[in-house]
A protein has these predicted regions:
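Membrane-helix boundary/coupling elements in multi-pass transport proteins
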Residues: 59, 98, 121-139, 243-261, ...
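TM-loop-TM module centered on a large, flexible mid-protein loop between adjacent transmembrane helices
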Residues: 104-105, 111, 142-154, 229, ...
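Membrane-interface loop-to-helix entry segments
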Residues: 138, 168-219, 231-234, 272-276, ...
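Hydrophobic alpha-helical segments and their helix-loop junctions in multi-pass secondary transporters
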Residues: 139-147, 200-227, 288-292, 402-421, ...
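Membrane-interface "cap" regions at the ends of multi-pass membrane proteins
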Residues: 1-60, 64-72, 76, 82-87, ...
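Extracellular loop-to-transmembrane helix junctions
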Residues: 34, 55-161, 275-278, 586
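Helix-loop-helix junctions that connect adjacent transmembrane segments
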Residues: 28-34, 72, 148-174, 196-322, ...
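C-terminal membrane-solvent junction of multi-pass transporters and transport-like membrane proteins
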Residues: 165-169, 231, 357-366, 405-576, ...
Length: 655
């Protein structure tokens, strides 16, 4: 019996390690980076991250093979879903101006292992995104020279007939990644200046495309004789919108750069809103122009926009578009290489990844080791994988990060901020609830006197409510919710919300096509999932939120992040099975890294004092007055069978 209790105690403590949250410093503006980026810098960085290969390559691929002219609708859906996610990023970026983006946001609200998995997937997202851009850059340059580069490579380097790999090695794409890596290592100020130059050229070319495109537009290209507006139907539109997410993944570079922003509280939300609005408008208008210029089924997926002008007899315009596309893709590549090492740095700085990647160059003030190593890995990916495989793999990691950031917004909105010096949840003795206190005469134990003083004030003065407590207006109807600690019901409700959203989207996606459910069971499952989803929203909504702050706050919480979670999960399920398989393999690799290194070297793990389990606790004897008798006592121990077992039993008794 004692052995079983010891083992269960060890397991409980280990699970507690996995879900610990990050302790924020009191001074969030303190950083080893150089805070030099303005709102304009961040906005152009975001535009550069979004408007690139997605505009010049992805539009042609999706229009021809997935959605047809209805790619316009696909971009609208993807833009709305991205807007919901972007607003979540904006709130976090303003409140937590630390590098790390989705990884950091998850760490301070959900827990360590989830943050590591999100960070691990964001690393993959940026590596694949940069490799895909380099592949697209190479393809566009090759099209200018009539595919002579490709033909030369196939003749002299040979071709590959290996599943999941490209048909031939792309040395040009690999080389451009290495060159961009060298530029990024010069520092944030130089990278920002270089991005300004390429972004200005790109935006000028986009204006040229829109003006010339509408002049050359042929409305009959959307007619039934050419296949109609939506030749692939609703399914094609939704599948296209899932892939279109690739076009918008660049906005999180703004949140990643928050530790280098001069005034992150204002600059981050403004830059995200402006850049996403401009990028969405550009994608919708350009995809409209493209499918109106030439029939969608005749598009060249590798260089759709330039080829469209060639086919209309404006070869000079095609050269301008090709040159502009190369500049635009340079901005995306720089954006990915700018963000990737900063995510790696954030994880290494927290102890979850190898410490060597936390080194910052004293002169350039950038994580140069992370830049060089992961820039090289990105160049290898661009060398051996083709664009289509890279793009599909990219979307799933992005959508998962968006989902966890949305959930993190809800959790953080309904809990007290945790700063350095405060106890982390789960490290203290459980505090009895008010109802438990009223219904028992047993003394109640706490690990600090301040814990009890805080709770006594809340028990005696119901008007003093903290985030996560039941609103006073709902106490007559939902009084049983007062039995739980502040934020506990919200945390459980967020889990229920995510599970019910996953069930609902799974039924909508697979219920008729894959599972072939009868109508009655299909309807019943949708109804039950919808009720669970709505019920969890209601339970969250009846609790107190944080008071309004001076920083940007997402409107309509929890509804807005809940919609973001639903849309993200729906789009994830529209991706192919092979994408999920590759994603699962990457997750397994990440778990191996975490359990072999991260969980033991985490700085939050080092914060746990070895003497924590033997400090004095306080016993509080209930009384009818505000002042209660408080007496310090020594830690409890149970009868021991050896010194080690006695110590472990004492720790288990406290927990």
């Amino acid at each position: 019996m004692a052995t079983w209790r010891l083992r269960s105690g060890h397991l409980a403590r280990f699970c507690q390690k996995l879900n610990r949250v990050k302790t924020l410093q009191d001074d969030l503006m303190e950083t080893s980076f150089n805070r030099c980026l303005t709102t304009v810098d961040l906005t152009l960085l975001g535009i550069g991250g979004m408007v690139g290969s997605g505009l010049y390559v992805l539009t042609g691929t999706i229009a021809k093979e997935t959605a047809g002219p209805a790619i316009v609708v696909s971009f609208i859906i993807a833009g709305i879903a991205s807007l919901l996610a972007a607003l979540c990023y904006a709130e976090f970026g303003a409140q937590v101006p630390k590098t790390g983006s989705a990884y950091m946001f998850t760490y301070v609200s959900v827990g360590e292992i989830w943050a590591f998995l999100i960070g691990w997937n964001v690393i993959l997202e940026y590596m694949i995104g940069g490799a895909a851009v380099a592949r697209a850059w190479s393809g566009y340059l090759d099209s200018i020279f009539d595919h002579r580069i490709k033909n030369f490579t196939e003749v002299h380097a040979g071709t590959w007939q290996v599943p999941f790999l490209a048909h031939y090695p792309d040395f040009l794409a690999s080389g451009i990644v290495l060159i961009a890596t060298a530029f990024i290592s010069f520092g944030a100020r130089f990278s920002s200046w270089l991005n300004h130059v390429f972004s200005a050229i790109s935006m000028g070319v986009i204006l040229f495309i829109l003006i010339m495109g509408f002049i050359l537009a042929r409305p009959q290209n959307w007619s039934a004789s050419e296949g109609g507006f939506a030749p692939y139907g609703i399914s094609g539109i939704m599948a296209g919108s899932a892939t279109c997410f690739y076009a918008f993944v660049g906005f999180d570079v703004i949140a990643t750069s928050s530790e280098e922003a001069r005034n992150p509280e204002k600059a981050i939300p403004r830059a995200i809103a402006i850049s996403l609005s401009l990028a969405t408008g550009a994608y919708i208008l350009v995809s409209m122009v493209l499918t109106l210029m030439v029939p969608w089924h005749s598009l060249d997926p590798d260089s759709a926009l330039a080829d469209a002008f060639y086919k209309r007899g404006y070869s000079w315009a095609g050269f301008i578009v090709a040159a502009g596309s190369i500049c635009a893709m340079n901005t995306v590549l720089l954006s990915n290489l700018f963000s990737l090492p900063r995510i790696v740095y954030a994880m290494a700085e927290d102890g979850l990844f190898f410490q060597v990647f936390a080194r910052v160059h004293p002169r350039t003030q950038v994580p140069v080791v992370a830049i060089v190593v992961f820039g090289f890995l990105m160049s290898v990916l661009s060398l051996i994988f083709d664009l289509e495989a890279l793009v599909q793999f990219l979307s799933i990691g992005t959508l998962l990060a968006y989902t966890f950031v949305a959930a993190s917004v809800i959790i953080l909105r309904f809990q007290q901020a945790k700063a350095e010096g405060q106890e982390a949840p789960g490290r203290t003795e459980a505090i009895p609830t008010p109802d438990e206190a009223a219904g028992t005469t047993e003394p109640k134990e706490y690990e600090s006197f301040s814990d009890k003083l805080q709770l006594v004030g809340k028990e005696k003065a119901g008007s003093l409510r903290e985030p996560g407590q039941l609103k006073a207006a709902f106490e007559p109807y939902l009084e049983f919710l007062n039995d739980f600690y502040p934020g506990e019901v919200v945390g459980v409700s967020v889990v229920v919300l995510m599970v019910s959203a996953l069930c609902l989207t799974s039924i909508l996606v697979f219920g008729k096509t894959e599972l072939h459910l009868p109508t009655w069971s299909y309807t019943l499952l949708i109804l039950l999932s919808s009720l669970a989803f709505t019920g969890s929203l209601v339970l969250i909504g009846v609790h107190e939120q944080k008071q309004a702050t001076q920083t940007f706050q997402l409107p309509l919480v929890p509804l807005t992040p809940a919609l973001s979670i639903f849309i993200n999960l729906f789009l994830m399920l529209k991706l192919s099975y092979m994408t999920w398989l590759r994603f699962s393999i990457w997750l397994v690799a990440g778990l191996l890294v975490y359990f072999s290194y991260g969980v033991w070297h985490s700085k939050e793990n080092l914060r746990d004092s070895p003497t924590q389990d033997v400090r004095a606790r306080y016993v509080v004897f209930p009384s009818s007055s505000l002042e209660e008798t408080v007496q310090p006592v020594q830690p409890r121990t149970e009868p021991a069978q050896g010194l080690t077992e006695a110590q472990d039993s004492g720790e288990e008794a406290k927990r």
